[in-house]
């Protein structure tokens, strides 16, 4: 018998099993393909589950959309702190006499328009005090004619407004809001809304007529405090028929009407939440009433001071940003403390153009 070498023996053995092994491999190939596909699908499913469980806070920064900048839809521009009244609870007092040059104020208003502003509200202080209302009138006309803002409004105590102002600028103004805290003249004097022999309530009625004559929507603002919280104003408000009656709860702001550096001491005017709610309940039949508690006031207004700085009131004081004239609107508004959700919740966005109000003049 022939004796085979190891190499020859291995070759002979391979030739014997080649066909069976080939057949076995062909039968196993589909199984291997199926197993590979199955494991790939399982791994993919596991990765997706892990992404879901991670949540939005654990996603990669590069996959997150950056937060959208706040849009200054409605801005309150307190261009002056000077006033001819001495309301005891005033929360924007005469701490400076500064007023921007007219062209600088216009530049700032243009920046706000470019950032998305739709409504501008001019306030103070008393806005009609500067240049006998001419400074204000020119800003009103600029905002309506050149910036084409849907809404231009003013908040005033009404004591310095003359009919000639309506003749010159009334067509450019959408809403005039007059501050009136009481229909009892003695209470007005006690609060600080008095000026010699002038009657605040009689002047209010005259302004209502002018607004009707010159097609300006009429609004009333009232601050509810210790001296008027028990008053019933239902009949008087209904007779004046404003488009809105804003009812504010007396608010303390450190450095303005309370604290060491304050020019007012408003603590004696403050009322509790329950007292404020009782006042609202007493006037629930007044359809134009728009209530605003302290919390809504602090967080839901974009307030611009005389230097065009946004004021953050969230901590019970006014912390200013840098001026929009220096850093732009998008950067300054980051420090405004503005709560857009609260702004919408309190009804901050409403029909505010007199063209859309469809009033019966």
Swiss-Prot record:
Species whose genome carries this gene: Homo sapiens
BP GO annotations: CD4-positive, alpha-beta T cell activation; CD4-positive, alpha-beta T cell differentiation; defense response to virus; innate immune response; negative regulation of protein secretion; negative regulation of viral genome replication; positive regulation of immune response; positive regulation of T-helper 2 cell cytokine production
Subcellular location: Endoplasmic reticulum membrane; Golgi apparatus; Endoplasmic reticulum; Lipid droplet
Protein name as annotated: S-adenosylmethionine-dependent nucleotide dehydratase RSAD2
UniProt-listed Gene3D superfamilies: Aldolase class I
Induction: By interferon type I, type II and bacterial lipopolysaccharides (LPS). Little or no induction by IFNG/IFN-gamma is observed in monocytic cell lines. Induced by infection with hepatitis C virus, yellow fever virus and Sendai virus, presumably through type I interferon pathway. Induction by infection with human cytomegalovirus (HCMV), stomatitis virus (VSV), chikungunya virus (CHIKV), Japanese encephalitis virus (JEV) occurs independent of the IFN pathway.
Recorded domain comment: The N-terminal region (1-42) is necessary for its localization to the endoplasmic reticulum membrane and lipid droplet.
Annotated positions binding [4Fe-4S] cluster: 83, 87, 90
Pfam family, one: Radical_SAM
Enzyme Commission number(s) of this protein: 4.2.-.-
Other remarks on this protein: Up-regulated in atherosclerosis. Latent viruses like HCMV may be involved in atherogenesis by initiating local inflammation. This may induce up-regulation of antiviral gene RSAD2, which modulates lipids synthesis, and thus could play a role in abnormal lipid accumulation leading to atherosclerosis.
